[in-house]
Amino acid sequence: MLALFFSLAPLLSQALPLGYTAAPAESFYFWPENISSLQAGEIFRKRELLTLPDIFDFGPNLEKVVQVAYKTRLTDGNDSFSIASIFIPKNPSPELKLYSYQTFEDAVQLDCAPSYALEVGNKSSNYLPVTSNLSAISRELEKGRHCIIPDHEGYISGFFAGRQEGYAGLDGIRAARNYLNGTNETPIGIFGYSGGAQATAWIVDLHDEYAPDLNFVGTVSGGTLVDAWGTFQYIDYPKVYLKGSILIMYTGLFSGYPAQFEVIWPYIEPVIQENMLLLRLAPNDCNQSPILQGYNNSIMAGIHVDLPEFPASKYIFQHESLLANYSVVPVSTPKFPRYMYHGGSDELAKLSLVEQYVDQQWNTGANLTFVVYPGLLHDETAYRGFDAAMDWLDAQLDSGYLPPVNSTHT
């Protein structure tokens, strides 16, 4: 059974890359034969979307959408690839400026990827989550900026595998910049909330080491998950009603570490194993509503190891933390301006973990604005904080600098 799980992603990427969905452009997602000879972010395939679903109304501001397939890497260093969707403005600004939006895919199937949802619309069951906040794209197109939505989970659909998302996101931005004939000086702003914020946070963390050629002038993340084990402690047992979402997080996270996952697998209860496979195999089922019906325990209770101490899982958690006191990999403090916002009563992303991360970043010289919306839950904060965050990012792209405000309240 485990062999089937691990073989699924490469199998789909070469033969049935979109969870068996019969899409006219299936071959666009096939594995390239020459990937080992490509550079990170190098484009090996591209296409123009001839139509967009009816929900997208970009008015007179959108010229076209181009999708590019590019090389990236997995957490273990092996070659990988992903897709980036590039929105070309009708009236581009004189200076090329890029805006990258990491949407919340929050799924572990390839046919849940943003690029596919943009192509097929509601034929993808992840269509609405992926496209729920494209007003930001419209806003930037109106300003003449080129916009990017990378498939930051990559072809392994590694939701919650932060390092995997960071590499795929950085290479997607790099691929878009190269497609648009940008340079190392091209100004770039990035934005993500919730699952997209986690990807954004890892893009930020890995930037200096992996992609210092990208000129980030401002980054925004809201409702950010900064520590995998701390997140599971916060939501797994006390919020058993979220068990489907939690299992998706375990499945995506462990998929980013196949060697360690293989060690953990025999200790996972059969019902959870079966549902992990179902998450991967059920065609075009991104919402996962039937997952774990009748199972009323926490997921961690169904994994019969001491997760924070068992060597394989401990390795994963210590590599999937942005907290300097827990991560075994140095956490970076980039010098470009950043903005983070969070709900004071966020039920998914624990505020105290984010505050700990922010304090550590401030103590090491970060240029970081942090805003907390007292009493607001996760989804409420997404909408309440959006305009202020985008205003900040627009100012960064306009002027290239805003002084930090080390604020912990609105």
UniProtKB/Swiss-Prot annotation:
Give the location in the cell.
Answer: Secreted
Q: What happens when the gene is disrupted?
A: Results in the production of exclusively acidic sophorolipids and a complete absence of any lactonic sophorolipids.
Where on this protein are sugars attached?
34, 78, 122, 133, 181, 296, 325, 367, 406
Which residues catalyse the reaction? 194 (charge relay system), 346 (charge relay system), 378 (charge relay system)
Pfam families attached here?
LIP
The task this protein performs is described as: Responsible for the lactonization of acidic sophorolipids (SLs). Catalyzes the intramolecular esterification (ring closure) between the carboxyl group of the hydroxy fatty acid and the hydroxyl group of sophorose C6'' of acidic SLs. Lactonizes acetylated acidic SLs, producing di-acetylated C18:2, C18:1 and C18:0 lactonic SL, and mono-acetylated C18:1 lactonic SL. Does not catalyze the reverse reaction, the hydrolysis of lactonic SL into acidic SL, nor hydrolysis of triglycerides or paranitrophenyl esters.
- Could you tell me which InterPro entries the record lists for this protein? AB_hydrolase_fold, Lipase_secreted
The family line of this record is: Belongs to the AB hydrolase superfamily. Lipase family.
Chief location: secreted
> What temperature notes does the entry carry?
Optimum temperature is 20-50 degrees Celsius.
Activity response to pH changes: Optimum pH is 3.5-6. Stable from pH 3.5 to pH 8.
Q: What is this protein called?
A: Lactone esterase
- Fill in the PTM field for this protein: Glycosylated.
Q: How is it used?
A: Sophorolipids (SLs) are a family of fungal biosurfactants that have been commercialized as biodegradable detergents in ecological cleaning solutions. They naturally exist in two forms, a closed lactone and an open acidic form. Each form has distinct properties, acidic SLs have better foaming properties, while lactonic SLs are better in surface tension reduction and have antimicrobial activity.
Taxonomically, which superkingdom?
Answer: Eukaryota
Q: Name one GO cellular component term.
A: extracellular region
